[in-house]
A protein has these predicted regions:
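Acidic-glycine-rich active-site phosphate/pyrophosphate-binding loop
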Residues: 1-11, 44-58, 233-252, 285-302, ...
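Flexible, glycine/charged-enriched surface loops at secondary-structure junctions
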Residues: 2, 44-48, 89-94, 115-117, ...
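A structural signal for small-residue-enriched, beta-sheet-centric alpha/beta enzyme cores
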Residues: 2, 21-25, 55-59, 63-66, ...
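Conserved phosphate/anionic-ligand binding catalytic regions in large, soluble enzymes, centered on
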Residues: 20-36, 255-272, 313-318
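Glycine/charged-rich beta-loop-alpha catalytic/anionic-binding loops adjacent to active sites
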Residues: 10-20, 56-64, 249-259, 299-309, ...
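Early transmembrane hairpin of solute transport permeases
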Residues: 28-127, 131
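Signature of multi-pass transmembrane helix bundles
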Residues: 109-252, 418-425
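Hydrophobic alpha-helical bundle architecture
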Residues: 37-40, 66, 277-290, 300-366, ...
Length: 425
């Protein structure tokens, strides 16, 4: 059995990370910040400046904002949040936008009331919303996490100043306690009632948007191409449904997703493949619940090293966790699960992140292909030897090394990606 402190921390991590969000999380974060700033200002702004870190710019430029009528971009997310956002709904801030508010948003965008500036900051998730109406001004800063407001200033008066020097959002749950052994033990032994509501919400929400993606017209429709091109096997079903959910989300669908590590695509990628597998294999609900607990915690564990935003695509981490979760459901011992992780990371330790957009679905499909191959290799007793490339003696060490590459080694790559993306702007 796990120590009570670890058990409660793991429950806390799941509650903090697995929350519903509507739309891609970075534009939603901007909308939330703008909605909060508008509340403080107390009136519709006449001028707005959005100062955004490079990773925020990268992840907002190309993705369709939900309930916007097809709008994309930082200005649209900020102005819609200011006009129609309900900050009390957190990551579902834009869930109640009406047609009048959409029209007003377009009018203000036509007037170009919002300008965007690059914020030179070492914090990858960092932006400041500045608003002005008449003689009143407001500045609101969000850092480290999508709705973590660290500073509010109105008319030169500081209303809030709670910057967290650790570089992490303060949380009740201690993420430093995460490790593969304890994650496996926790998944094996957790009281189902302690996680049932969170897990069932993830199953319900993420599968609903997956089916919406299959029937609606979003992106390139790669789910259909996958189904028509490949045999109707388990992998095809997993890849097509997961890609469909991602395309719907990136394509502006207003249905909520239960996210992981601040990302809807990661929440989708670490859950939908397991749900498909469990249903195809007719496994009991409790087996799926425990596997989803394992997969979600493994995703968080990997992202602790990489960071919420980086030059690495988070779909790889989540797909790696999905592959390991399938091994878990298939009865694989911890040693076999570790082989699945190592096999995945030996194949695709990282795909570059060039922003949130509809092609994220293709990256998820490719990552799941690698993860499912890794699963089958591991279940057949095959794995790459330690020190094959970046692999270490233990899977946990390899995860740490991949995180180090993504967080530190790829900093200059991230800057170059942003430079290339902004060339035509």
């Amino acid at each position: 059995m796990l120590d009570e402190r670890i058990y409660e921390s793991y429950i806390g991590i799941l509650k903090e990370e697995m929350v519903p969000a509507m739309g891609c999380t970075e534009p939603i974060a901007l909308a939330y910040g703008a909605a909060r700033a508008r509340e403080v200002l107390g009136k519709e702004p006449e001028h707005i400046t959005a100062k955004c870190s490079g990773n925020i710019i990268k992840n907002v430029r190309c993705v369709i904002i939900p309930n916007s009528g097809g709008l994309t971009g930082i200005e649209a997310g900020v102005v819609l949040g200011a006009v129609a956002g309900n900050a009390s709904l957190n990551m579902e801030v834009l869930s109640n936008v009406n047609e009048f508010e959409r029209k007003r948003c377009r009018e203000l965008l036509d007037k170009k009331i919002c300008k965007v500036e690059l914020l030179d900051s070492p914090v990858v998730l960092h932006f400041i919303i500045e608003m002005q109406a008449g003689d009143d001004t407001v500045s609101l800063e969000i850092k480290y996490d999508h709705i973590n407001v660290t500073k509010i200033v109105k008319n030169q008066e500081v209303l809030l100043d709670s910057d967290h020097k650790s570089g992490e959002t303060p949380a009740a749950a201690d993420r430093t306690l995460l490790n593969l052994e304890d994650i496996k033990t926790f998944a094996d032994t957790v009281e189902i009632d302690d996680v049932k509501e969170i897990i069932e919400n993830q199953i319900r929400s993420n599968m609903a948007i997956a089916h919406e993606g299959m029937t609606g017209k979003y992106g390139l429709g790669i789910d259909r191409i996958i189904r028509e091109t490949y045999s109707n096997d388990m992998l095809t079903k997993m890849r097509s449904l997961t890609a469909a959910a991602s395309e719907a989300r990136m394509g502006g669908c207003d249905m909520p997703v239960v996210i992981n590590s601040g990302s809807g695509n990661q929440g989708i990628a670490c859950s939908v493949p397991l749900i498909v597998y469990a249903r195809e294999m007719e496994l009991p609900d409790y087996v799926l619940y425990r596997a989803l607990v394992f997969s979600n915690l493994l995703t968080v564990y990997q992202k602790q090293y990489i960071g919420k935003l980086s030059a690495f695509c988070g779909a790889v981490s989540a797909s790696c966790a999905a592959g390991a979760g399938i091994t878990y459901m298939g009865g694989g011992e911890l040693s076999v699960i570790k082989k699945t992780i190592e096999n995945t990371l030996a194949n695709i330790p990282g795909i570059i992140c060039d922003g949130a957009k509809i092609s994220c679905a293709a990256k998820i499909a490719a990552s799941l292909d690698a993860a499912f191959l890794a699963h089958h290799l591991a279940m057949n007793g095959q794995s790459y030897a330690p020190y094959t490339g970046i692999l270490k003696e233990e899977a946990g060490e390899t995860i740490s090394c991949v995180g180090q590459i993504g967080k530190e080694g790829m900093k200059e790559t991230d800057k170059e990606i942003l430079r290339i993306m902004l060339e035509r702007v």
